[in-house]
Amino acid sequence: MEISFQEGDAVWTEMRERGKNELYYMAGVICKYGDVVGMTEGMHKIMCKVVEKKTGVPELDTCPQRLVLMPRGSGKSTIISQAYVVQRIVQDPNIAILICNEKLENAQSFLAAIKHTFEQNELFRALYPEVIHPDIKAANVKWNDTEINVPRTTGRKEFT
């Protein structure tokens, strides 16, 4: 997607807000996973609403835990373990998130994909400059295979 907005204009503001508030949009458009996992409204939009607790069904939206079961290759991990984490960081840069998996390599792969979004995704970087370090190689910035830290407004000791 060619960037055709200026920071602060109506298009920029709308895209930022949609990404912050709609996981389906964050995953499919901003993180660019739509074509990668073949996102569809019928399956993936519903999954995103369940994850975000925005189904409109009080019993689902107020439940403290959610279990999402989908077939292998359907994009569940890409959307939930990557795009949802990116969205939560954008919503609250002071958050601390633990990414775990049965295999360490999978958790590291999820973090690598998240880092790629922050480092290489020009659309994401243009929409959310406040969570991008100007110099991720700086000595005081944690940015490696096991932990990252985005700019924060608090002195929280845990990494992002």
Question: At which residue positions do the language-model features occur?
Answer:
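Conserved aromatic-histidine-acidic binding/catalytic patches
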Residues: 35, 72-73, 98-102
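Walker A/P-loop
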Residues: 60-83
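N-terminal accessory segments
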Residues: 1-64
